[in-house]
Amino acid sequence: MMRCQIVSSSRAGRAPRAVFLWLASLVALGWLFVGGAAAQGGGELRFCLRSEPKTFDPLKVEDDASESIRYLTGGVLVRMNRQTQALEPGLAQSWEVSKDGRGIAFKLRSGIAFSDGTPFSAEDVAYTVQQLMDPALHSPTGDSFRSGPGNVETKIISPTQISITFPAAVAGLDRLFDQVAIVSAHSPKKEMAVLGPFVVADYKAGASVLLKRNPNYWKSDAQGRKLPYLDSIELDIQANRDVEMLRFKRGEIDLINSLDSEYFDKLAATSPQQVRDAGPSLDSEQMWFNEVAKAPIPAYKRAWFRSQNFRRAISEAINRDDLSRVVYHGHAQPAVGPVSPANKFWFNGKLKAEPYSPDAALKTLQADGFRLDSGVLKDRDGNAVVFSIITNAGNKSREQMAVMIQEDLQKIGVQVNVVTLDFPSLIARMTQTFDYEAILLGLTNVDLDPNGEMNLWLSSSDNHQWNPEQKTPETPWEAEIDKLMRAQASSADAAKRKEAFDRVQEIVYEQAPFIFLINKNALSAVSPAVHGAHPVILHPQTFWNAEQLTAGK
């Protein structure tokens, strides 16, 4: 999520693009292990992905593992510097946004080739945009550009010049291209031909992804040395945090991109120089109920989950202060809503974290006919309130939170069954079979700007997790959010955008489709073997400058 002014000139400082990714571990936030031998360069950076990447197609990315690979391999027209939060030239050496906010013209660098040697030109940009905006592709990245109905027009002026015109104004248009990895229009390797610093060299399902230095990468450092410095990056697929920490301590991996607070404190006690706390992050942990009409759950339970009073009551009955204190050892704060207070411009300061009150929760439930019967909460038809919460196995923080939520809700007569699943099984239930009642996961905010959240809040989106891909909004409040999100996305007036997105946050607070729990600090661990790492709060926190990292013994 990102804040700041809306910029229309090529090098204007710009807020990062806020795209919410459901982390594989969705909660886990990807990892990267970086190594470094600063002077000599070379070496291998070793790190872990906390789940299997769902795709290598950069236009279809919606999970954290795939996003990490896209970031490391994809070449973009403009890149948001994760440290300064300013836009910097990428494959485009300059660009200009039209005054009406509908168009953008790029001047591309010449003499660049994809990793397989295929020349890069404006044709590839046009092809990428056409694919990105194709409704049949269902690109989560493309959702950020959908501010109005109609087709996108691309005009190739020369091999190094292209203009793109959208049917309606798109706020922060230049910034959004930070997430658009350009794909080749002609390479037989399709999306596996890349323009970023690394290329996928090997993939062993369930085990690892090996990235190697892209020999055709166009960047050099200030001394004229070709980037990246690293020869390779080995990404091990490892969901178990205990194993990950053990491997870090043994020196088998170089970096932990998102460190649990328990591990942070333990490592800080013995090796304080290896831990980094960048402060409050943009990411959140939350739970939600399944409201999908075709989900294989009893109708009476779906009625509970679709009730605003039920969702609000569950939220009121959860002790967020305890979650922050016990689970995160003080390295977290109770969440207010979809925007972290660390996102200073876009955060709605009028909202306050839900106060813990079992009494208020019971009162709210009574409005829907729920009642306590010998310590058991029942609905008006006599059905005992029982549901399961699923979360990803191996994530100790989530597992502990689920148990604490179970204990909190027991105080109002609700029986919660906690179920842990491997991440692929969880994702399948969440996105394919809809065979679940409630889910506890995390949300990663890639940018500060609400435009990056279009794929989360639009009712038609497949990332609208509680009830995705609605043909038309099924509730008045979702219709209002659709309208507000499109309005802010098509406005060049920062004050009007802020007003619209403040209202979105208020609706989400009132309706509680997501029950936001905590915002955790950006904690990471970096091996002394890694040189050049400067962790930040924006994704990818530790390896945002991977092309400049070095790894050594």
Q: Residue ranges of each PLM-predicted region?
A:
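N-terminal secretory signal peptides that target proteins for export/translocation
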Residues: M1-R17
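Cleaved targeting-peptide boundary
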Residues: A39-L45
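Sec/Tat signal peptide C-region and signal peptidase I cleavage site
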Residues: F33-A39
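Extracytoplasmic/periplasmic ligand-capture domains
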Residues: C4, R79, Q83, A105, ...
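N-terminal lobe/hinge region of extracytoplasmic solute-binding protein
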Residues: C48-K99, Q130
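Surface-exposed binding/hinge segments that line
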Residues: W22, Q40, K107, T141-S187, ...
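Bacterial N-terminal signal peptides
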Residues: A18-L32
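A structural "hinge/loop" feature
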Residues: S51-S68, L91-Q93, T118, T141, ...
